[in-house]
């Protein structure tokens, strides 16, 4: 029988990250882990305040579906149990990871997707003086 657990991992941000909506000194990540026999699937979600999410609200959402997940709810049923957001993402990723580990087949193959490749990303410069922002952008 699967078991669902949730925890918080905190990662310090070098200096302060400042944008118009506020400042951050750490990134809090909610981790969902689903264990079943010898396999453990893991997924993450980062609560996003702009959408009304907090670490506590994401943990509560995960807790609200614990019995369904432990009773065998799958990724399809999960879509009806939780709204889009960090909690659903964390559990969905944990279910994909668990299925991949059980089968010995990478998650992207199970999903029918192409192999992962490097992607371009963006970096947001913190609000500061023009000189500080120019230095950070250099």
Q: Where is each model-derived feature located?
A:
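N-terminal capping/lid subdomain adjacent to the active-site entrance of alpha/beta enzymes
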Residues: 1-138
